[in-house]
A protein has these predicted regions:
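Macromolecular interaction modules
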Residues: 1-113
Length: 113
C-alpha cells in the first residue's frame, strides 16, 4: 500500500528569519508531539525556481500508513492544533494543504557503452 501524506506548502514569508525561528522552535516540535499516527516528516526549504524567485518557501510532508490514519490525525485535537498553528505562523499568506498518495520510482545507474 502506498504511503499517504499530508503536504503543507508555505508561501514565501515577508521575514524569512522570523519565520524560520518560529517554524524550527515552535512548529516542528508541536507537529512532532501532536500529529498522532505519523510515520515520518520531511521538511523541504525551497531555494529557487527556474523562473526566478519561487512563490513558496517551505514544503512539509507528514507521512501516514493509510488514509484512515491521516484522517484520524486531522480530526484529532492534536491534529487540529498543529494545522491551526501552521496557518498562524504562515507569514506570507495562507499555506496550502494537500492530501497525497506517494509513488516512488527508483532508477539504477547505467553506464554508457
Amino acid at each position: 500500500m502506498p504511503d499517504m501524506k499530508l503536504v503543507v506548502i508555505y508561501p514565501r514569508p515577508k521575514d524569512v528569519d522570523a519565520f524560520e525561528k518560529v517554524y524550527q522552535d515552535e512548529h516542528v516540535p508541536l507537529a512532532v508531539a501532536k500529529l498522532g499516527g505519523k510515520t515520518k516528516m520531511v521538511a523541504t526549504k525551497i531555494l529557487g525556481s527556474p523562473q526566478g524567485t519561487a512563490p513558496f518557501y517551505r514544503i512539509a510532508e507528514v507521512y501516514f500508513p493509510s488514509i484512515h490514519a491521516l484522517e484520524a490525525c486531522a480530526a484529532s485535537e492534536g491534529g487540529k492544533e498543529a494545522l491551526a498553528h501552521a496557518v498562524k505562523i504562515s507569514a506570507g499568506g495562507a499555506p496550502i494543504f494537500l492530501v497525497a498518495e506517494e509513488e516512488t520510482f527508483t532508477f539504477t545507474k547505467t553506464v554508457n557503452a
